[in-house]
Swiss-Prot record:
Subunit-structure text: Homodimer.
Uppermost EC category: lyase
Pfam families per the UniProt record, alphabetical: RuBisCO_large, RuBisCO_large_N
Gene Ontology biological-process entries: reductive pentose-phosphate cycle
Assigned protein family: Belongs to the RuBisCO large chain family. Type II subfamily.
Cofactor: Mg(2+)
Amino-acid positions noted as binding Mg(2+) in the UniProt annotation, renumbered to this chain: 191, 193-194
Binding site for substrate: 111, 168, 288, 321, 368
Miscellaneous field: The basic functional RuBisCO is composed of a large chain homodimer in a 'head-to-tail' conformation. In contrast to form I RuBisCO, the form II RuBisCO are composed solely of large subunits.
Site feature location: Transition state stabilizer: 329
Annotated gene: cbbM
Name of this chain's protein: Ribulose bisphosphate carboxylase
Residues where N6-carboxylysine is found: 191
Amino acid sequence: MDQSNRYARLDLQEADLIAGGRHVLCAYVMKPKAGYGYLETAAHFAAESSTGTNVEVSTTDDFTRGVDALVYEIDPEKEIMKIAYPVELFDRNIIDGRAMLCSFLTLTIGNNQGMGDVEYAKMHDFYVPPCYLRLFDGPSMNIADMWRVLGRDVRNGGMVVGTIIKPKLGLRPKPFADACHEFWLGADFIKNDEPQGNQTFAPLKETIRLVADAMKRAQDETGEAKLFSANITADDHYEMVARGEYILETFGENADHVAFLVDGYVTGPAAITTARRQFPRQFLHYHRAGHGAVTSPQSMRGYTAFVLSKMARLQGASGIHTGTMGYGKMEGEAADKIMAYMLTDEAAEGPFYRQTGWGSKATTPIISGGMNALRLPGFFDNLGHSNVIQTSGGGAFGHLDGGTAGAKSLRQSHEAWMAGVDLVTYAREHRELARAFESFPADADKFYPGWRDRLHRAA
C-alpha cells in the first residue's frame, strides 16, 4: 500500500522544522528492495516508525494524523532519507516526566529495521529540539571532575593518562592489583576491561579490596591522586547497585577517585540510566563493547558510531569510548573527530545536522585501542586538543621496561605535544619515551623515519 500521500511531505523545509521546535529529525541511508519505489518505501518506513501499519485502520482520527512521522526530504541517488518525528510520539517517565532513550530507539530504529521492502536503512545523524533535549538527564560528572581530583586546571587539564589491565581475563586478584600499582606509579587512571567483573578465579570483592589498597600505596609513594574505573555492568538493576555500593564503601576516603564502567551497548539504556541516577556523584564510564555489530561501516543497518556517541551524551554518560580516529588498531578514520566535538561542544556539526542548545555538561571522549606513546602526537594534531581520557593496554604493558615505564612514556608523549617539541627530540632526555621507540619499532619506523640516528645523536 502506497502511503506517501499521508506520510510524505516533501514541501516541508528543514529550517522551518527546526525553527518550529516540535520535531526530532533523523537522517538515514536507505535502499528499497528491488521493485519498490523510493518515496513509497520511505513513507512506509515513516508509517511503521510512528502511527501507521500496512493497512488503513478505522480507529485513526485527526489527532492521530497530526502526530504522523513525515518524510520531508529524499535523494534516491545518494540513498538519503530524512524523517521528522513529532516529539509527542516519544514516551515519558510516569515518575518525573523525563525522556527515555529506549523510546527514541524503538521509534527511530525499531521495527523499521526488519521491513520487507527495505534492503537496508541506517541512521547517520539526528537532531533534537530544545523542548525534548532538556528532558534527558545529561552528564552529572565529566573530565573536569577528574582534573579536580588530580589537582589540575579544571578548564584545560589535558590528557588523563590511563590503561586497561591486560590480559583482559585470567589474572587473579593479587596479580591484577599488582599491575594496577605498577601502572599508577607512572600515570593516572586504570579501567577494568569490559569482561572483568566477578569471575570465579577473581572474585570482585577480593579484587576491589586489593585494588583500593594498591591505590592508597601508589598515592603515598607518588604524592599524586589516582583514579580507577570499576565495572558494575550486570543484567540486574539491584546487582549493579550492590556492586557500586560495595566499591564505594571499600575505597572509602578515595570514593571520589572511582568511576563506574557500564557496558552500555550490550546492556542497553536501562543500565546507563541506572548508573546515572543511582550514582550521580561518580563519573559514568560508557563502554561500547559490541557496538560494531551495527555501527561498523560494513553494517548497512542500525546506526553509526556518531549516533551512538550522541545518544550517550543525552543519557548522561560522563565519558564514552570514541575509538582512535584512525590512529590506533580499531576501525575508524580521522574525520571521526566530529564525534568528539558533538560530545564536548555546546553546538556542533554532525554529518547532516547542527545540534545546538545542549545546556548540559560535556561528555568526555575516551580514546583506546592500539595506542602508544608514538601514536599520540598525531592523534592530538588531528583532534586539536588533548582534553581526553586515553587508555593504553599494550601501549603501557608492552613497554620493554614494564608498566611503570610505559605509563611514564605516555605522559612524556603528552608533555612533548603540549610543549610543541618533536617527539624524538623530547625522547633524548626522557628515557621512558626513548625506550618506547625501541618497544614499538614498527610504529617508530612508520611515524618517525630515521629515529634511530636522531635519538642517539648528541643533543
